[in-house]
Amino acid sequence: MNLSATLILAFGMSMDAFAASVGKGATLHKPALREALRTGLIFGVIEAITPLIGWGLGLLSSQYIMRWDHWVAFTLLAFLGGRMVLAGWKQQPLETSLVGKHSLGVLIATAIATSLDALAIGVGLAMLQVNILHAALLIGLATLIMSTIGMLLGRFVGPCLGSKAEIIGGLILIGIGCNILYSHIGEAMLAHLPG
């Protein structure tokens, strides 16, 4: 795999984290650059680690992992997104409804959920001639950049939306989960078509 293909892969893999970061940034009144960088760093590190794990597991057993990763991602994202939607629906003041929503634990759970597709990519990369450390580093760096930008973009969207920002952020997470599930189910259905 050449450098341009790896870069395209890296930025493609960062899109889920970017969308989640926009939603997360929108729920904050004004996320500071420090908070945006923290989010980008957490998303980037986890996004870099998961293809390494997937690559290692792919050398052992790719079929089992690829059978379940999309369900785990969907469940985590739907749960986190559902919590955000319910809190926004109750129309709690934004400051109180978000207590704990941006905690390290929630941030890591969101990052893991959006990076499970990178786990599957890692499994696939195990079948190719690729420098996995180079690919993982580029994926992590692209995700760090895109997540930081996403948080900062969400900053401008949030004040316009008020308490609806949490609902939209939750719907974005649910949408990402549904997209992951849909793409894997669609691929499975296409694989079973005759001809």
From Swiss-Prot:
Membrane topology: Multi-pass membrane protein
Keyword Methyltransferase: no
Family: Belongs to the MntP (TC 9.B.29) family.
Record bears the keyword Membrane: yes
Protein name: Putative manganese efflux pump MntP
Gene Ontology CC entries for this record: plasma membrane
GO molecular function: manganese ion transmembrane transporter activity
Function, in words: Probably functions as a manganese efflux pump.
Membrane-spanning ranges: 3-23, 40-60, 68-88, 106-126, 132-152, 165-185
InterPro entries: Mntp/YtaF, Put_MntP
Cellular compartment(s): Cell inner membrane
Pfam families the UniProt entry points to: Mntp
Record keywords: Cell inner membrane, Cell membrane, Ion transport, Manganese, Membrane, Transmembrane, Transmembrane helix, Transport
